């Protein structure tokens, strides 16, 4: 039976004649139906078989794995009468390895196979390369290195599959030196197009597009769809979206048609560019081509419309061919959250009968980006109760972000404990999130412990540590971390200097502040932003060096249009009791923010600090009759896992009388302490 038509005819004839199919014929039909996408028919043939052998079980399990139904494949595998061999194990192992959320099952099965070697279930090179690919997916280089050792020990490290898998794994894990060693050290006969494509992808991840192109052009056999798709994706991931589109056009000019991966890569580029017009054109081509049945293509279409802010088109596309596609659903959730529509996002989220980590993460990030920490923590409780997904580092980062926003350490410590118990990979993003959370919760010691225990660091992690120390008055530690950072070869950015200048401002360290400000501009070629200027102006103002603040203001372009900088300079004038400058700043500031009530209050207080009560009354009088926006500051306390929020002179709390009574006693005690100290 070489084709589907022959298989159908043979099957129909056997049904009409009432004859029983042989085991060989049944196995052929199962394979034929599964290859043709007829999974239900394949299962029916399998269920009707009177006699099954190991080939029968392998055929039907492979069919379910092919269609990403590892749950059903596992049930068949674990059934009492299932006959298994190495192919059966490898088939299910590959299914677990490529299915999101089943990575732990793959690791368990690999361990089981290792234990069953005495039962003739030998681990072969396919088994190990499958696990190497899983290591790449998890970016777990430690596990990947162990598997590399197994391949070397068994003499399978030079096979074509092993070479391409190892290149891919080390590339994904950021070990580019090892990538080059494997590629350059392999025999030419084992470096096939798969390995060369893996090398192209590795160069792209490293950001070296020129070398990727060099490999591509030097090997004419790479003029295929896979190689072109790799380059298109490589340009895109390095921020060269326009070049990626040109490469996609060149691909067709070279006689190659776009496939599902091409459409997916192009749609990702259009999402980044927010190109609605071209997105619609590609959408039309997808409909004509029929590639919309691919989940990545259909979710890519939805994502383009979401990124372009056209939720009406996105909703239509999702309903037409994204229904049941969790990647499409996650794009919709991100689209809704980007427009602040978390009610719609939550409604879609709740309507999903099945949720994977991608969907959960989209919801977590949606709430976090809109600064709704309570909702993040509530969602985290629902995630734990769900018990169908194991939290990954991105989920943990989202919850830790919520803890940081509320300075709420307890959930953060629970996540820390969970990560230690489960042995989850502490990547740089997760370590940075822990450092940030502990710092913002006031436990700088814990933050430093985690920072010191990290083997891999980057600029973002150093920034979190420097900012944490600066915020809590440990300016010497901030400066030391900066020295360690630069000595380690990490390049500071504008956030680094923002943290350093904040440390100087808190302690009134004028000389150090000037040194870092000058270094930022001259040594690192970083243009100062509003935050850097306000730090320096505050620093000069508190040090009673108003002349320096004036000199700095004179060198800032378009300063009269920046309300934040003018507000900082107003404070500096107030501290130095310079009412003439307060008057000048008042005129400029109210032109920009004449509807902001907080600015009127700030100006009135500036006059009051200099004893100019007449000017203060004038400002207060101007406020009358105007519809001004006044934003009240607030404080909160967490007691028994419940947040209590208060604004100035708040009387809304149900225990208001008791709270004010306690505040009265505390204030009285503090006054007595002040008198004793004086």
Swiss-Prot record:
PPR repeats lie at residues 22-56, 57-84, 85-116, 124-158, 159-190, 192-222, 224-258, 259-293, 294-324, 325-359, 360-390, 392-426, 427-457, 458-492, 493-528, 529-563. It comes from Arabidopsis thaliana (Mouse-ear cress). InterPro entries: E_motif, Pentatricopeptide_rpt, PPR_At4g14850-like_plant, TPR-like_helical_dom_sf. Belongs to the PPR family. PCMP-E subfamily. The keyword Nuclease does not apply. The lineage of its organism: Eukaryota, Viridiplantae, Streptophyta, Embryophyta, Tracheophyta. Keywords: Repeat. One of its GO terms (biological process) is RNA modification. This is Putative pentatricopeptide repeat-containing protein At3g18840. Residues 641-671 are annotated as: Type E(+) motif. Pfam families: E_motif, PPR, PPR_2. It comes from the Eukaryota. Residues 565-640 are annotated as: Type E motif. GO terms for molecular function: RNA binding.
